[in-house]
């Protein structure tokens, strides 16, 4: 049925005709997510009529039908202004049982009405900044959090739980104040950690299920997304022992999530949300990833269970096949693996054995090939600075932050970006908690080491001599041409001669010479003033 016909029926006020018109419209547009511009004014008129009835109170008998029509029209951005009013939002929140009230949450609400109201609110909060502001002012997050806390005691349908969590996700993603309110005032990390454990259906010390069912997967992903929003900056602050215990408890659940498969071909998506949240944990809490007890069939390395680290590495390999949004795909898992390797020697040695095995092929450039090392070295020169930074940082940590070892595996040309940023162009080693790991050279590498070009990281074929057959006068002429070309480029600021400062940073040649001379003068006792 057309919006104009439905609006005409509403204006007649005949209950049966109105109900039938709404039901017909709902059936026809249940899967409509885009709308015809030609009927825009008719839809706006219908929306205003619906709002007037909504604010006065919907008939209990046909409440679901009315809410379904509101839900469909709330997908249309041209109708948002009508629905995004304080009165409309309050009415929808009342039907969803999430208005702040002294009264307890009803024991047996109408779940169909509650669900439709939640869907309407999700649509409005997603698309309307006004609705976002009004929802925050109405403190809807308080009642939502209270209901999430009741999931263990009361039985709510899957869809109600899912849209509770979806609305929480939208509010925390779009409103900083709601994010802080849930994190601090409502103790959101503890609340949602308990909800995650309930959804996964396991205790931290038990083995994870083989497959997480589809509905539990959907709810778990929403919980992970809300937790990500509210813990986004928690890693930047120190945590006390009580908070550290909570984050470690959450870490054990995330460890389960990494190891479990998700139904409906959603495993990679599920693991992606898990890894994103792992990156928000305080660094000292990541030790839970290596705390899994050894059992038959587990992957042991240096007496430590590496099942979780191996699973994260396999996830990284999958993500490296992505061709778009590479930063979002690989940066979180690379950050987690980097911190695990930096803080735990067994993890670093295991990852190095997998990613940077002893060099045998010395005739292929480090970035060429399909090995994991080759793919990561290619990322070191990616256009996205964040992508190349995290890839280089990961490999640098696997090399125990040893500059010669880093250059050996990646080539000086690929390594130059990180070394310049760290002030390590002149070599050396930054301060770090690393033991002296052995880096055993293969026979092939030892034999070719003297012939390896440090810039490209491989043995180069000896190029022909371009001056072969030239007379001395011709050579001198070509040399002067080259000098003049460089001089012209330098004078026109196309290129700038660079040098190494005493601190190991690249700087202009003039500045580098000045710093060197200043350093020499300051260290020369004869240069002191009389």
UniProtKB/Swiss-Prot annotation:
InterPro entries: ARM-like, ARM-type_fold, Chaperone_Ric-8_A/B, Gua_nucleotide_exch_fac_Ric8. It holds the Pfam family Ric8. Disruption phenotype: Death during early embryonic development. Heterozygous mice exhibit impaired spatial memory and decreased anxiety. It is found in: Cytoplasm, Cell cortex; Cytoplasm. The keyword Chaperone applies. Expressed in neurons and neurites of the CA1 and CA2 subregions of the hippocampus (at protein level). In adult brain, it is expressed in the neocortex, hippocampus and cerebellum as well as in the pineal gland and ependymal layer. The modification Phosphothreonine is found at residues 440, 442. GO terms for molecular function: G-protein alpha-subunit binding; GTPase activator activity; guanyl-nucleotide exchange factor activity; protein folding chaperone. GO terms for cellular component: cell cortex; cytoplasm; cytosol; membrane; plasma membrane. Disulfide bonds: none annotated. The modification Phosphoserine is found at residues 435, 501, 522-523, 527. Keywords: Chaperone, Cytoplasm, Guanine-nucleotide releasing factor, Phosphoprotein. One of its GO terms (biological process) is G protein-coupled receptor signaling pathway. Chaperone that specifically binds and folds nascent G alpha proteins prior to G protein heterotrimer formation, promoting their stability and activity: folds GNAI1, GNAO1, GNA13 and GNAQ. Does not fold G(s) G-alpha proteins GNAS nor GNAL. Also acts as a guanine nucleotide exchange factor (GEF) for G alpha proteins by stimulating exchange of bound GDP for free GTP. Interacts with GDP-bound G alpha proteins GNAI1, GNAO1 and GNAQ, and with GNA13 with lower affinity. Does not interact with G-alpha proteins when they are in complex with subunits beta and gamma. Interacts (via C-terminus) with RGS14; the interaction stimulates the dissociation of the complex between RGS14 and the active GTP-bound form of GNAI1. Interacts with NCS1; interaction is favored in the absence of Ca(2+) and myristoylation of NCS1 is not required. Belongs to the synembryn family. This is Chaperone Ric-8A. The gene is Ric8a.
């Amino acid at each position: 049925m057309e919006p104009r016909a439905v609006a005409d029926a509403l204006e007649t006020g005949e209950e049966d005709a109105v109900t039938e018109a709404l039901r017909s419209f709902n059936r026809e547009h249940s899967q409509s997510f885009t709308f015809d511009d030609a009927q825009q004014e008719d839809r706006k008129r219908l929306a205003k009529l619906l709002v007037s009835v909504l604010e006065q109170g919907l008939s209990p008998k046909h409440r679901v039908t009315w809410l379904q029509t509101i839900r469909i029209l709330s997908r249309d951005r041209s109708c948002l202004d009508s629905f995004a009013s304080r009165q409309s939002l309050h009415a929808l929140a009342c039907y969803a049982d999430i208005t702040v009230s002294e009264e307890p949450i009803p024991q047996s609400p109408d779940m169909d009405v509650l669900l439709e109201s939640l869907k309407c609110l999700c649509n409005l909060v997603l698309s309307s900044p006004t609705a976002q502001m009004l929802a925050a002012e109405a403190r809807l997050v308080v009642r939502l959090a209270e209901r999430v806390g009741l999931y263990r005691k009361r039985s709510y349908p899957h869809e109600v739980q899912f849209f509770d969590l979806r609305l929480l996700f939208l509010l925390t993603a779009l409103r900083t104040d709601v994010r802080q309110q849930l994190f601090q005032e409502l103790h959101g990390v503890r609340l949602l950690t308990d909800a995650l454990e309930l959804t996964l259906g396991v205790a931290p010390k038990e083995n994870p299920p083989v497959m997480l069912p589809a509905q539990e997967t959907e709810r778990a992903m929403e919980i992970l997304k809300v937790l990500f929003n509210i813990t986004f900056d928690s890693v930047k602050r120190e945590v006390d022992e009580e908070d550290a215990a909570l984050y470690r408890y959450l870490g054990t659940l995330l460890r389960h999530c990494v190891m479990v498969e998700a139904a409906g071909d959603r495993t990679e998506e599920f693991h992606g949300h898990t890894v994103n949240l792992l990156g928000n944990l305080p660094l000292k809490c990541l030790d839970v990833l290596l705390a899994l007890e050894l059992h038959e069939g587990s992957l042991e390395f240096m007496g430590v269970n590496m099942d979780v680290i191996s699973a994260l590495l396999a996830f990284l390999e999958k993500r490296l096949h992505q061709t778009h949004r590479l930063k979002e795909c690989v940066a979180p898992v690379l950050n987690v693996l980097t911190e695990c390797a930096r803080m735990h020697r067994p993890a670093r040695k295991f990852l190095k054995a997998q990613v940077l095995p002893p060099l045998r092929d010395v005739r292929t450039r480090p970035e060429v090939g399909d090995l994991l090392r080759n793919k990561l070295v290619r990322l070191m020169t990616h256009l996205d600075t964040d992508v190349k930074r995290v890839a280089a940082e990961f490999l640098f940590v696997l090399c125990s932050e040893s500059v010669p070892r880093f250059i050996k595996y990646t080539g000086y040309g690929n390594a130059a970006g990180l070394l310049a940023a760290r002030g390590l162009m002149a070599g050396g080693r930054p301060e770090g908690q690393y033991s002296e790991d052995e880096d055993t050279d293969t026979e092939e590498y030892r034999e070719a080491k003297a012939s390896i070009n440090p810039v490209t990281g491989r043995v180069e074929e000896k190029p022909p001599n371009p001056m072969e057959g030239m007379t001395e006068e011709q050579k001198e002429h070509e040399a002067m041409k080259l000098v003049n070309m460089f001089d012209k480029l330098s004078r026109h600021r196309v290129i700038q001669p660079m040098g190494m400062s005493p601190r190991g940073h690249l700087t202009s040649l003039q500045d580098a010479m000045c710093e060197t001379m200043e350093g020499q003068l300051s260290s020369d006792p004869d240069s002191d003033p009389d």
